[in-house]
Design a protein with these regions (language model features):
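Domain-level signal for soluble alpha/beta catalytic cores
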Residues: 1-928
């Protein structure tokens, strides 16, 4: 029996137990720097402590002991200690060349222990743990360049191939891709997993575990859970689930949502609650038991385990509770198409519905250099912001998908596609919808697919170059997790008749479904929309044949969809917009009734079929439906008549008549302060110049505009982000809008300062020694840079001495310390002590998942005379600095000191009221 079937058999009959935290257990051994280094890495520069994966090589006894204790506790699946065993993560420790060996050794040690505990009744499985790395493929690290990337899909894919190859050789039964915060990272890892399995001739189940960044349920890169599942839907993964970020109560609603729609086994391994003020986890196996019982008793999961703060004692308790309980019943695969950007687009199965039905998907056509002269000009001029405005307007006008095409002889289509798609990823109003990647060059399509975390549509593949190329392209579509448009072309040429259209569609369908293994729901046929009313009789039936072919495809090829480039139909009437849109409206009215559910159209220009005058409608229908010979001549006369009226109206306008101006958006009628705040919240920069000019006439100094309405807007954004009402890509876009506003104000500030520096201040940022997590710090850097602060980013694992030295050298105004793991809290105290010893009294801002205001009050503030501020989330740093550096800075410092004194007093009072565990047991209520 293969690995997949073995695990499937177990999941079908019982709830499997996954192990708990590795880092929590390693800390119990009180290992030294020398333990982590061993003799082998004694001379490697930098700190090694905290690199848990290197212990596979230097202290295999410790790692084996932890595996053993989880197996003794009853774990069915143990995770290899390989979370960071890839070059990207190990580069922080100068050990990238040892990453594969760490993966292999971590898996081998787990395999040895699992085999010792396995029995026929209770087989034990080893999961090769693949962590998310501290880099993201979907977001830019550069404030001024939203298209920039710290890492590419290909780089991540290559590193994960090496890691997974080591895991497979080490003997894992499962690949576990966990703590996923960026779906594009996850897709590269899934790609690597299946690539290496194929290379080694094995089939292993792939588990995927998501982490969300807020209670709204979005990933750090902005996707909803539903959009994430759509992105994964083309892959044959074994299970999906969630880990980290939350305790069980916070995670449960998301697991319920996932279980209702995900056609996979469901896993959950929550933290031992949420970190307390000191960064520790207060939950015990006993206190977690009723929380986990809800997952088990309600049939929400197939696999349950623990993440941060959990231990073998937790796992033993979960194993007892799960004994004999029924697992989650896997949901049926959806019978409708899933596409996604940041949000889910669900395309219902074919229903013969009217043209205005939501089942029809408008594909925006204007981001196509071949079809829009304006878009081509903007791309040629590198006017990307204006080009993005075209995409944004299409979505606002009703496009549910945006088509992007960069095929022009004078463009580097691949580079422009990558650049534009990366820029779209930074625009939530556009990125929320799926992208249709449109090119005649296959390398352009694959490059585009590697930029999108959502489930895209490839436009297109065909049998034009033969079956071998068709199959290869289709396999790439599957590999990168997309749907595809299939053109009705084959080796003979383009299908122009009904018979040829259905012949090619049927052949392509069976190759894709039966040979390639593509989900029929992910196939969109384009039976070729061709120009009618050309004066050539053989063209007269093109629209009718398309509509007939649409009905045949949706009837005989189950699940398949139909699309078309609608504007091709009216090509004979280019220059007469009214006639063209009327033809499109009539065509879509009939084609959709027969099952056409996608159309590449100008969504804004869609004409209402029912509002076309009867005498015009009769003529147009005669042409579209080929109801009588010579009808196109009547249409030509109608077109000429309409053009004549349009020309007359144009001439009248030129003679003095003016068209009414479009009504201003409602928010533009508000006060200048509210307009600026709204612009920041929404990331709208179009009106900044006019609004700032007005504000400069109202406020005495340019800096007052920043300190007033602009900072008020940023504070609102921070609050919305903290409440889960905004997500990270929106916050980053807001920060860029703030930067644009500051750049407008900058010359005024410089003039007022008579040439002095116009920067708001200089801030040194660092992830502290022993911690390699830098995504939060990078977000802080982006937001602060956009708020006109000079940011000096020292990177990760920065020793206290270096932070102090740089703060002095750079003449910094503040220091920002970041850390994700519990040991970082102690290191932050050490940094504050070193700054105190150096005579510095600069403000210190601390942030990260384990930090808290209470920890600052109890541990950091008492050892440092300067102000120390706990920053709840990345969007708030700029506002805090503005307060610290402003005229009321001294009052703010005094307020902080009073607040910390109150917190310390409250904490000590609570501790005085708490008895020991033994005292509590002795004083328990005895009811019997």
């Amino acid at each position: 029996m293969g690995h997949i079937n073995r695990l499937k058999e177990q999941c079908d009959r019982k709830i499997l137990i996954l192990d708990g935290a590795m880092g929590t257990e390693i800390q119990k051994y009180n290992l030294t720097e020398e333990d982590f280094r061993g003799e082998r890495f004694a001379d490697v520069p930098g700190q090694m402590k905290g690199n848990n994966d290197v212990l596979n090589l230097t202290r295999p006894d410790v790692i084996s002991d932890i595996y053993r204790r989880y197996l003794e506790a009853g774990a069915d699946i143990i995770s290899a200690n390989t979370f960071s065993s890839q070059r990207i993560s190990q580069a922080d420790y100068h050990l990238e060349d040892y990453a594969r060996e760490m993966a292999y050794q971590g898996a081998r040690l787990a395999r040895i222990q699992a085999d010792q505990f396995s029995t026929p009744d209770k087989p034990r499985f080893v999961a090769g743990d693949v962590g998310p790395t501290n880099k993201t493929c979907s977001m830019s690290p550069d404030v001024s360049n939203p298209a920039a990337r710290d890492i590419t899909y290909d780089e991540l894919f290559d590193d994960c191939c090496e890691q997974i190859d080591g895991l497979i050789e080490g003997g894992v039964d499962v690949i576990l891709i966990e703590t996923v915060f960026d779906t594009l990272n996850c897709k590269a890892m899934i790609d690597a997993a299946f690539t290496m399995m194929k290379k080694r001739g094995v089939e292993l189940p792939v588990m995927v575990s998501l982490t969300v960044s807020d209670l709204a349920g979005r990933t750090l890169s902005g996707q909803t859970i539903e959009a994430f599942l759509a992105s994964l839907s083309p892959y044959p993964i074994f299970s999906v689930g969630m880990n980290c970020a939350f305790g069980a109560p916070q995670m449960k609603p998301f697991i319920e949502r996932m279980g209702k729609i995900a056609p996979y086994y469901i896993s959950a391994h929550p933290n031992a609650g949420l970190p307390n003020e000191m960064g520790a986890y207060d939950e015990t196996p006993e206190s977690m038991a009723p929380q986990i019982a809800e997952f088990i008793d309600e049939g929400l999961v197939n696999i349950i385990g623990g993440c941060c703060g959990t231990t073998p004692d937790f796992i033993a308790r979960y194993a007892q509770m799960a004994e004999g309980k029924k697992p989650h019943v896997v949901t049926q695969r959806p019978q409708y198409m899933w596409l996604s950007g940041l949000d889910l687009l669900q395309v219902d199965d074919h229903v013969h519905a009217p043209i205005d039905s939501s089942r029809f998907v408008n594909v925006g056509e204007r981001c196509n250099v071949a079809g829009s002269r304006k878009f081509l000009r903007l791309i040629n001029e590198k006017s990307y912001e204006e080009a993005l405005g075209i995409a944004r307007k299409q979505v606002a006008d009703g496009a549910a998908v945006v088509d992007v095409n960069m095929d022009d002889g004078l463009l580097d289509a691949k580079a422009e596609m990558v650049n534009f798609l990366n820029m779209i990823a930074a625009e939530p109003e556009i990125a929320k919808v799926p992208i249709m990647i449109d090119s005649s060059k296959w390398n352009v399509i694959t490059a585009g697919l590697k930029c999108c975390q959502g489930k895209c549509i490839v436009n297109s593949i065909s049998l034009k170059e033969g079956e071998e190329v068709f199959v290869a392209h289709a396999k790439d579509v599957l590999r990168y997790g997309a749907a595809c448009v299939v053109m009705c072309f084959d080796e003979v040429g383009q299908a122009t008749t009904f018979e040829r259209r259905i012949e090619i569609a049927e052949r392509a369908y069976h190759i894709l479904v039966d040979q390639v293994g593509m989900n029929p729901l992910d196939i969109i046929f384009d039976p070729n929309v061709l120009a009618i009313a050309t004066g050539m009789e053989e063209h007269d039936n093109y629209a009718v044949d398309f509509i007939r072919a649409t009905e045949w495809i949706t009837t005989h090829l189950p699940g398949a969809h139909v699309s078309g480039g609608v504007s091709n139909l009216s090509f004979s009437f280019r220059g007469n917009t009214y006639i063209r849109e009327a033809i499109h409206s009539v065509f879509l009215h009939y084609a959709q009734q027969k099952g056409m559910d996608f159309g590449i159209v100008n969504a804004k220009a869609r004409m209402d079929y029912h509002k076309i005058p009867k005498e015009q409608l009769d003529i147009i229908e005669d042409v579209v439906l080929n109801r009588r010979k010579g009808a196109y001549e009547d249409l030509i006369e109608l077109a000429a008549e309409i053009k004549e009226k349009a020309d007359a109206a144009k001439a009248a306008k030129a003679g003095g008549a003016t068209a009414p101006k479009p009504a201003a958006p409602e928010w533009r009628k508000d006060s200048v302060e509210n307009r600026l705040k709204y612009a920041l919240r929404k990331g709208i920069s179009d009106f900044l110049q006019v609004d700032i000019d007005e504000a400069l006439g109202k406020y005495p100094h340019a800096v007052n505009v920043i300190e007033g309405p602009l900072m008020d807007g940023m504070n609102e954004v921070g609050e919305l982000f903290g409440e889960g009402k905004m997500f990270l890509p929106q916050v980053v876009k807001t920060a860029r809008t703030m930067k644009a506003a500051v750049s407008i104000l900058q010359p005024h500030i410089e003039a007022e300062k008579e040439g002095g520096s116009s920067k708001a201040g200089k801030v040194v940022l660092a992830t502290v020694k022993g911690d390699v997590h830098d995504i939060g710090k990078n977000i802080v850097a982006v937001v602060m840079s956009c708020n006109n602060y000079d940011v000096v980013d020292l990177g990760v694992m920065v020793p206290a001495e270096q932070i102090v030295r740089k703060a002095v050298e750079e003449k910094a105004d503040a220091v920002g310390l970041s850390g994700l793991i519990t040991p970082s809290l102690e290191e932050m105290v050490h940094v504050a002590q070193q700054m105190q010893n150096a005579g510095l009294r600069l403000p210190i801002m601390v942030g990260g998942a384990t930090t808290s205001e209470m920890h600052v009050a109890l541990k950091i503030a008492p050892v440092y005379d300067g102000p120390v501020v706990w920053v709840k989330d990345a969007s708030l740093n700029a506002g805090i600095c503005a307060r610290l550096f402003g005229k009321d800075g001294a009052a703010y410092e005094a307020e902080l000191k009073r607040r910390y004194e109150q917190l310390r007093q409250k904490y000590h009072e609570q501790q005085a009221r708490l008895g020991s565990l033994q005292e509590a047991r002795e004083n328990k209520l005895n009811l019997f």
